[in-house]
Design a protein with these regions (language model features):
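Histidine/acidic-residue-rich, glycine-tolerant segments that coordinate divalent metal ions
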Residues: 195, 204-327
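Active-site core of metal-dependent hydrolases
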Residues: 216, 223, 279-389, 396, ...
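His/Asp/Glu-enriched, well-ordered alpha-helical/loop segment
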Residues: 310, 385-476
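Histidine-rich, glycine-flanked metal-binding segment
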Residues: 71-85, 94, 99-142
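C-terminal cap of metal-dependent C-N hydrolases
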Residues: 92, 451-452, 457-505
Length: 505
């Protein structure tokens, strides 16, 4: 009998148990008359005896735990790699994410994944540290950008492709979009709908390149709601029946009672959601619900809020109209997505209650408009017409406002991601825009509490904060249009202390 090199970790035992449970399920299914293998065999050639099943399971357990093979069982599963290097930025002016003015020429020392020191005086680094020194030559060092409403799974993928393709293919497209997002200067995104848990893990473990991800998982929607992406031939829904394609992919989760909403919310939390996303009103891209519709009941919304709060986090809700927004606030929702058709009393209510407003600069886009169905075109025109009023109300009542792009199904728009930031100069100064997309968005992300996947300071250049940084050729606090061309103007992109781009070598 061979001995193990190490005791199996709890995570590995759990994975083994899950694997065995899956095999038991598969074994029983293989012997059901309705399953394909039995139909092909035409006879039940494999006896359904408990002794054979037990022998199979014991064998699987032995293989899985390495008891019959010279397999070393590692002590821990792959962890998140923490950079151990040292980087020194010299002679940079700092936009710290909060102050509207740049600092005097300064030096910034990064050790591992953290900003260790900021000083106007020279910083001396131990010669043995093998530090990488980057001469800023007066350029601007600023926090990495944060998009508070992004969809890595859906931003650049056309909707028909999303709804009809294999999950493996869609994951590859999402991984490509993740790298493009980081190379655009976005070191963190709050992903508000889509199966990105595996992608997040791969990025965190250094397998793939991309931003930090605050995942919501599946968008929770009522039947006929904005997140009901089912084809008509998938209706009527049969209780206990198979899930729809969009649910199987993890894009959406349909729920039609407080108990079902609670279950769907808990499922996302089980996957590791940092916040829960509910569809509580009509949307533009969904053809079967009016933009004016109010979705879910207050008890249904409250069920999600309770599930999230029990996990130390919060619910954010998609809504455009005052009635839907008010119902969500009454049920305990902490953040409203969109809200472009809000009225003034509801805006004041948001300010009074301290509700976050995740608002996007949605505006007329000829290319996007022509690709829409007539139903969506009509709704888009309504929303676009409300954008200016929404931002003016947000400023008037000093509502806590987050910035995000919410680009969907449009590869061209995804490539122009940064223009959704520069266009904000219609309502805010460049420094205010940058603060919104860095420190303010970082404050919103912190609402995820104990479900925060990256507990630490984000969106600021301050001692002790995560080293998520951009070195910009020019002053974006004076000229916000610099962000429109990250390939040209972002000389260095650093995330978690690791340099992903450096054109100053």
């Amino acid at each position: 009998m061979k001995t193990l090199a190490a005791e199996p970790a709890a995570e590995e035992l759990y994975e083994t148990a899950s694997f065995v449970y899956f095999i038991r399920w598969l074994w029983s299914r293989c012997l059901e008359p309705s399953f394909g293998l039995t139909t092909i065999w035409k006879f039940k050639l494999v006896p359904r005896s408990s002794s054979l099943l037990a022998a199979l399971l014991v064998g699987l357990c032995q293989v899985s735990l390495g008891q019959d093979y010279d397999i070393e069982v590692p002590g821990q599963p792959p962890g998140v790699p923490v950079p151990k290097g040292v980087t020194l930025f010299q002679n940079v002016r700092i936009f710290d994410g909060t102050s509207p003015t740049l600092t005097a020429p300064s030096n910034v020392l990064i050790r591992g994944n953290t900003i260790e020191q900021i000083s106007a005086s020279p910083i001396t680094v131990d010669a043995n540290a093998n530090a990488q020194v980057i001469a800023g030559n007066g350029r601007v060092l600023m926090p990495g950008l944060i998009d508070a409403h992004w969809h890595l799974f859906m931003a650049a993928t056309p909707q028909p492709v999303l709804m009809t393709s294999e999950a493996s293919y869609l994951n590859l497209l999402a991984a490509r979009q993740a790298e493009a997002t980081l190379m655009g200067g976005f070191t963190t995104v709050r992903d508000l709908g889509g199966p990105v848990f595996g992608l997040k893990r791969a990025i965190d473990e250094g397998v793939m390149v991309g931003p930090r991800i605050y995942p919501s998982g599946a968008m929770i929607s009522q039947t006929s709601g904005h997140g009901d992406l089912r084809f008509l031939f998938e209706l009527p829904r049969k209780l206990g029946g198979p899930l729809s394609n969009s649910e199987l992919e993890g894009i959406a989760a349909i729920a039609d009672s407080p108990d079902e909403v609670r279950l769907r919310a808990r499922e996302q939390l089980r996957h590791g959601a940092s916040q829960i996303k509910l569809m509580v009103g009509g949307g533009v891209s969904s053809p079967f619900n009016p933009i004016e519709s109010t979705q879910f009941t207050e008890p249904e919304i409250r069920a999600a809020v309770e599930a999230a709060e029990n996990w130390g986090t919060y619910v954010t809700a998609h809504a455009y109209m005052p009635r839907a927004i008010r119902q969500a606030i009454a049920a305990g929702v902490k953040c409203i997505e969109h809200g472009h058709l809000i009225d003034e009393p509801t805006a004041k209510l948001m300010a009074d209650k301290g509700i976050w407003w995740s608002l996007q600069p949605l505006r007329y886009d000829e290319g996007a408009f022509q690709r829409m169905s007539p139903v969506s075109q009509k709704k888009a025109l309504q929303v676009w017409a409300g954008t200016d009023k929404a931002y003016k109300l947000a400023k008037k009542y000093k509502i806590k406002t987050a910035w995000g792009a919410d680009i969907l199904f449009d590869a061209g728009a995804a490539r122009r991601h940064m223009t959704d930031l520069s266009v904000m100069a219609q309502w805010y100064t460049p420094a205010e825009v940058l603060k919104m997309a860095t420190a303010d968005n970082g404050e919103l992300l912190a609402l995820s509490g104990i479900m925060n996947p990256y507990p630490g300071k984000l969106g600021v250049v301050k001692q002790g904060a995560f080293a998520d940084l951009l070195l910009v050729d020019g002053d974006p606090t004076a000229n916000i249009k610099l962000v429109e061309d990250p390939e040209k103007n972002f000389m260095v992109i650093m995330k978690d202390g690791k340099i992903y781009k450096n054109t100053l070598k």
